[in-house]
């Protein structure tokens, strides 16, 4: 039997995970140069998490969350269960990592958040919406006595 097409939840999960991982790869912050008394611009030399491109620091939580979402969706498809718990758990990890760093960046005037942190937040929010929507759909169908698997 040929494999079925991915559901909207599966396609949305792929989009969300892509947003989160691409966001984790990109820089999350940049330093704003400070003007000295003589008028020249100087950048501080401290290393800030998220300053460089690549996976390091809290990005590991984003990657782990993305893996939870993908593996949970595959498990849900294979065993005909809802992927909602996996998607919500993944979104919590991703949103925690990105929002923690965004709050830290905004608390210091010399740092400006970059596109990466916003892409990661968007991916986490999409996963959260997908997980909650799927959970509500399953709850409504159970209440009505209908089939609740992800194929519906």
Can you annotate each of these PLM segments?
Residues 1-152:
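Compact integral membrane and secretory-pathway proteins
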């Amino acid at each position: 039997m040929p494999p079925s097409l991915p559901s909207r939840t599966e396609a949305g999960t792929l989009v969300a995970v892509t947003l989160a991982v691409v966001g984790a790869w990109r820089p999350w912050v940049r330093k704003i140069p400070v003007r000295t008394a003589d008028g020249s611009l100087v950048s501080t030399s401290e290393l800030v998490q998220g300053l460089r491109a690549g996976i390091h620091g809290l990005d590991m939580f984003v990657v782990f969350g993305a893996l939870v979402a993908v593996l949970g969706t595959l498990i849900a498809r294979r065993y005909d269960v809802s992927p909602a718990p996996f998607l919500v758990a993944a979104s919590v990890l991703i949103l925690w990592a990105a929002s923690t760093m965004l709050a830290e960046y905004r608390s210091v005037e010399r740092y400006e958040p970059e596109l990466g942190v916003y892409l990661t937040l968007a991916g986490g929010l999409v996963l959260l919406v997908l997980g909650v929507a799927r959970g509500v759909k399953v709850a409504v169908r159970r209440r009505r006595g209908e089939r609740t698997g992800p194929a519906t």
